[in-house]
């Protein structure tokens, strides 16, 4: 029985490799060509320079709405616990102070915060369009309007989605709705689902090119799973190997955040390359089929 199962699994692996080896080779070539480790380093640098202004601006916009102002603390805890492993408490403490200070800033200083936040969004936009090989770039006015919508409507949508998630969690957590421990399963899956949804939106909305949902979903699932695994591995490393604290002392938070941002961008770009590889490979297959059909028609005409 075990022998038959092993033979069956081996045949499935061989069949999977035979069916997808060309796609895997194409994906590998794209990864090498795009040099994602270099691009991730560039985005990490821009992110560290612009992330604090971006978060300060978005949280400031969110606090302008009474409903989201009440949810701000729970929203911050959700983001830091699920997207900044191990160092979330320290980061939250600093950013809370930054947001409080932002309310005392002048209009000129706040405008510079907006410009720094726009720099990060613009860098992400340019990087994704380069990966998708977009030739028709958006007009400057269109790009600025889109970036402005991200800064203003983005916090509202994030707040609404987390409020909805909190409502669903409260419903599922009620004993009468808890069937076969589904509430615990839902709570465990919520960070992964949130990551996948965020990646889907990123891969579809950012490139100035039509991206089929099924390809964005495939890339988002891989990126989401890698992101969750990376969070657990990163938290394990920080708790089990605290040697970085001995080396850096009070500055230990800085390399931790930089390393995590770099790993996060590697994962984001990997998911993007999976999405674009699936999209481009399907186009190449369609071209090959059409060329084969044309060659067959020519052979029939000659014969």
From Swiss-Prot:
Top-level taxon of origin? Bacteria
For this UniProt record, the keywords arranged alphabetically read as follows: Cell inner membrane, Cell membrane, Membrane, Transmembrane, Transmembrane helix
| Membrane-spanning parts | 48-68, 105-125, 144-164, 186-206, 210-230, 254-274
Q: Tell me which GO cellular component terms the UniProt record holds.
A: plasma membrane
- Give the UniProt subcellular location, in the record's own words: Cell inner membrane
Q: How does it sit in the membrane?
A: Multi-pass membrane protein
Pfam families from the UniProt entry: Virul_fac_BrkB
Matching entries from InterPro entries are given as:
UPF0761_bac, Virul_fac_BrkB
Q: Which family does it belong to?
A: Belongs to the UPF0761 family.
Q: What is this protein called?
A: UPF0761 membrane protein CPS_0609
């Amino acid at each position: 029985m075990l022998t038959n199962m092993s033979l069956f699994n081996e045949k499935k692996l061989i069949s999977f490799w035979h069916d997808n080896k060309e796609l895997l080779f194409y994906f590998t070539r794209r990864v090498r060509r795009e040099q994602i480790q270099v691009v991730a380093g560039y985005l990490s640098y821009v992110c560290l320079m612009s992330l604090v202004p971006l978060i300060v601006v978005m949280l400031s916009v969110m606090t302008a709405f009474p409903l989201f102002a009440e949810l701000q603390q729970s929203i911050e805890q959700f983001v830091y616990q699920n997207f900044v492993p191990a160092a979330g408490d320290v980061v939250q403490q600093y950013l809370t102070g930054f947001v409080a200070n932002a309310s005392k800033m002048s209009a000129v200083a706040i405008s510079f915060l907006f410009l720094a936040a726009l720099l990060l969004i613009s860098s992400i936009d340019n990087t994704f369009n380069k990966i998708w090989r977009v030739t028709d770039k958006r007009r400057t006015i269109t790009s600025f309007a889109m970036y402005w919508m991200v800064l203003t409507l983005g916090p509202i949508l994030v707040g609404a989605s987390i409020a909805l998630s909190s409502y669903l969690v409260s419903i599922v957590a009620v004993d009468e709705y808890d069937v076969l421990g589904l509430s615990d399963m839902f709570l465990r899956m919520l960070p992964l689902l949130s990551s996948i949804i965020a990646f889907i939106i990123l891969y579809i909305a950012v490139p100035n090119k039509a991206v089929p949902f099924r390809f964005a979903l495939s890339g988002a699932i891989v990126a989401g799973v890698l992101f969750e695994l990376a969070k657990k591995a990163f938290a394990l490393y920080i708790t089990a190997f605290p040697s970085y604290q001995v080396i850096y002392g009070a500055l230990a938070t800085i390399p931790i955040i930089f390393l995590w941002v770099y790993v996060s961008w590697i994962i984001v770009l990997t998911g993007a390359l999976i999405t674009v590889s699936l999209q481009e490979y399907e186009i190449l297959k369609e071209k090959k089929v059409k060329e084969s059909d044309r060659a067959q028609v020519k052979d029939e005409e000659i014969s």
